[in-house]
Amino acid sequence: MEGTFLGKPRDLGYAKRVFKKKLISLWPTTAARTAAMILGGVAVVGALVVAGGHGAWTGLVAARLAQGKKPRLEDFIVEGQWHAALISAVVCAVLALTASWWLPVAAVARCRPAPERPWRRWFWVGLAAVVVAGGVVRLPRLSHSLYNDETYTFRRYVAGDHKRQPDGTREWRPVSWKATLWGNQMANNGVPYSLAARAAYDFAVSRGWARAMLPAEVPLRLPALLAGLGSLVVIALLARRWGGAWAGMIAATVAAVHPWHVRYSTEARSHSLVLLFAPLLPLVLDRAVACGRLRWWAAFAATEVMLLWAFAGSLYFLVAFNGLALVWLWRRGDGVWRTFLAAHLVAAAVYLHLMAPCLPQMRQAIRDNPVFSAGISWEWALTTGSFLLTGMPWLNGNPEMASHPSLQRVWVEFPAAVMLLLLSAAALVGAGVRRVGSDPSGRVLAFSLPLAAVLAVTATLASGTLLISWYMLYLLPAGLVLAAVGSVALVQAARRRGGFAARAALSVVVLAWLGWTTVIASPLMTYRKMGKQALREVARFLAVPVNGVSPLAVTHRTEAIVYDPSLYSLEMDLVDLRRLLAQSDAEGRPLLVAFGYRDLILHETPEFLQAIEESGDFERVAHFPGLEEPQFAQNIWRHRPRPPSQP
């Protein structure tokens, strides 16, 4: 078929050749054309979803609120996925059109090995031994009772809950997979952990290793343990990148026994994933920049997604790290910053599909729940610094427990030793910053840590929200890396120079680690033998007959009921308590009342505490202390039934 165009004959074959030429000019390489086709296809699918769902899938949450109703999880899911599809369609379309601009065209030719460090066999054997030892150190913590936040995750995101019915009975309501993946009513669902914990728990139940509908600590904590042990390997590799094999071994060994790492790598929440992915991010970026292959950039994007998916508070670290990394890559002048930006856009699109339904729930929880408006004080800096350095708080938050770990107590008893520890630790970290600072990627990591802390504190002060010390957990792995690299750097400098300088450097290293090991012994042993809340122990105590008589056991302000759904949950007023007292006397059964959060009860219903503790009708028969705060202590009081009055 022929025709004319601008006075010249044209046929279909010529048009095809022109189109092909234009196509090649836009996407000159096979890789660019392949990327454009894949991304373009995703953009088309997203556009179809947006067009098909417009109107029907939007405004669902607002409509429910306008009707005075609580939005359903399905409303958040549908509306969130629609918005995610809209944004991802735009992102993929832009990336498809600009594929030749951001794609590393000469990736294979430019690929070069990372700064070479000989992979000695002893390093891997030693690292394996450290990982095994780290597992042994953490093993006792797997069987500790769950504490309040862990029970919330179990009830809302992993297994289910026994809901109290109007007649007083309890009905088991299992958690749906939608709730595991997208439920976030209290802004505390670390989704990757919840998915892994649910798989482990369901498998344990199916094999008969755990009882259905009841907590099983080991399966619930196993995903956290595996991620925590994996973080030891990543920390070792990151330290090895700048300090050699010995720095890697030191960093892994210190992380294996650091009380904060030990504790949060064994809690049934998503903390251990932060310990894993925070140090993995700079390691993968370093390799992606050195090699340039798309698989490394994909790994970098995936690491970002996993870190932010596990804990949204990691955003400050990501902003600081990626902002500095962008400046570094832009100054290189080889265009790799364009691939860096593209990886971020892909990560953002994927993250939105994973978290778009959760974000409105999190915003609503932070806005409406008073606990998120606590703010921070100057003591926060002392506490956070103490946790990062020694794994224990600065103040003893639970004065009733004299042996509770507290760096302030050590300071009062041995001020010179603590000061020496602080100075030597600062020297090690400073030497580490100087060593890694000789490399641009090392400077990015070193300076992103204080910048992330500043961003977190500034945002918290500006918004008046909450900033708990463990929110800064992403600082710990890199801090240990800097200290380990600094130790090796000082020793190497001492060996080169000799004389007094050598002895001084060696003294700093030895005193730092010797003093640190001495200080962390107490919190490490405490965390190994003691959980945060003894909820399981409370449930077991309440189930034991008193003088051969089954007690009338009730709970108030304690999550122990998750271990025994048959326990009666006492209401907030005294009417229920008086009724139970009368029932105890009538049936001749001792009444046991278990409660926690004493300070909260004292503030909300002081008459309840007065009736229990001051009336003389009750005696305390058990007390289970908790870690960090008095509210985690569990108290059990017993009322002896009065004999019926004689006529």
Residues of each region from the PLM?
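Membrane-interfacial, low-structure loops and terminal tails that flank and connect transmembrane helices
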Residues: 11-34, 102-122, 435-440, 495-499
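Primarily residues marking transmembrane-helix entry/exit sites
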Residues: 123-127, 214
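Membrane-proximal helix-loop-helix interfaces that form the catalytic/acceptor-binding platform
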Residues: 30-107, 131-493, 504-507, 512-639
